[in-house]
C-alpha cells in the first residue's frame, strides 16, 4: 500500500499501540502533524474530564516519532520502576531531522500528587556508539530489565565499509542515571549484536532484523525474523534466542576501539553493570 505524501502531515497513532492504564483509560501517542503528542483518554475514545488530570502527558517528543513511517517501539512498564510508579519506555527519533535517535524513559510522576519524582533517562545524544540510525522492531520487559530490538549501521564495521547489524539493547528498570552531567543518561545501557546466520567456515548472515516475538507464556525465548540486505541476494530466516545466552553475552567482555583506525577488539577483562535495589 502506498501513502499519498500530501496526507503525511495528518495525525497518526499507528506507530505505537494503545496502552491500557486500567479498565477505563488508555495511553496514546501520535505524530500530531510532525509535533508528537501523547495523552490519556477513556477506552471509548473520549477525553478525560478536567478533574481527571494525568501528570506527565502532553509532549510526545522521544515517546513517539515525528514521522509515521519511522520504525519505533514503546512499552508501558507498570512495575519495577523507581518509586514503584508506571513508566513508558520508547525507542524512536527525538528530532524531526532524525539526527537524535534515542532509547528513552519519560519523567516518572506520582499520579496521586501529580509530583515529578524522577527525571527522564535516555541514551547519550548524538553518540553513534549508542545508536546509529536505528530501525526499532520491538521491546519487551522481562524481570528487572527492558529489552529493545533494532537494526542499525554497524559502527564496528566502519573501517571495512558500511553494513547493517541487528542489535539487542538492555536497560535496568531501576536505573536512575549516571553521575553529574550524565544524570539524565542511562547508567545501565548495554547492547550486543544478534547473530542470525547459516554456520560454516564462511557463514551466511541474515543481518537485518525485521520483527520480534516473545510468547506471553515464556520469558526465556525470543523469536525473530531476519532478512539479507535489500541490495544483495534476497533471503530471510527465523532465529530464536535464549534469554540465558543473551545475559551471558551482557555479562561478558566489552569491545573497544583503541584508535579510529583500529579494529574493535574485546577488552582484557569483563566489566559488569550491577543493579542496586
Residue spans of the language-model regions?
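Disulfide-stabilized extracellular ectodomains of secreted/luminal proteins, especially beta-rich
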Residues: 1-277
Amino acid at each position: 500500500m502506498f501513502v499519498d505524501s500530501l496526507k503525511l502531515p495528518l495525525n497518526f497513532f499507528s506507530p505505537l499501540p494503545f496502552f491500557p492504564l486500567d479498565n477505563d483509560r488508555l495511553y496514546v501517542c501520535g505524530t500530531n502533524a510532525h509535533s508528537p503528542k501523547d495523552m490519556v483518554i477513556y477506552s471509548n475514545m473520549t477525553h478525560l474530564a478536567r478533574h481527571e488530570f494525568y501528570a506527565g502527558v502532553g509532549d510526545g517528543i522521544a515517546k513517539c516519532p515525528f514521522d509515521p513511517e519511522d520504525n519505533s517501539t514503546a512499552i508501558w512498564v507498570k512495575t519495577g520502576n523507581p518509586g514503584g510508579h508506571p513508566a513508558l519506555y520508547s525507542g524512536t527519533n527525538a528530532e524531526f531531522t532524525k539526527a537524535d535517535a534515542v532509547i528513552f524513559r519519560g519523567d516518572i510522576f506520582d499520579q496521586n500528587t501529580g509530583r515529578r519524582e524522577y527525571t527522564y533517562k535516555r541514551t547519550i545524544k548524538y553518540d553513534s556508539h549508542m545508536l546509529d540510525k536505528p530501525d526499532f522492531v520491538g521491546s519487551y520487559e522481562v524481570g528487572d530489565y527492558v529489552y529493545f530490538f533494532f537494526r542499525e549501521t554497524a559502527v564496528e564495521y566502519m573501517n571495512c565499509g558500511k553494513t547493517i547489524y541487528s542489535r539487542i539493547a538492555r536497560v535496568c528498570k531501576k536505573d536512575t542515571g549516571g553521575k553529574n552531567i550524565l544524570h539524565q543518561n542511562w547508567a545501565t545501557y548495554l547492547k550486543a549484536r544478534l547473530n542470525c546466520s547459516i554456520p560454516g567456515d564462511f557463514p551466511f548472515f541474515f543481518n537485518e532484523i525485521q520483527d520480534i516475538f516473545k510468547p506471553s507464556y515464556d520469558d526465556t525465548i525470543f523469536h525473530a525474523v531476519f532478512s539479507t540486505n535489500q541490495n544483495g541476494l534476497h533471503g530471510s530466516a527465523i532465529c530464536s534466542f535464549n534469554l540465558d545466552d543473551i545475559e551471558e553475552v551482557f555479562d561478558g567482555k566489552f569491545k573497544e576501539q583503541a584508535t579510529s583506525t583500529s579494529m574493535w577488539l574485546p577488552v582484557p577483562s569483563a566489566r559488569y553493570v550491577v543493579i542496586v535495589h
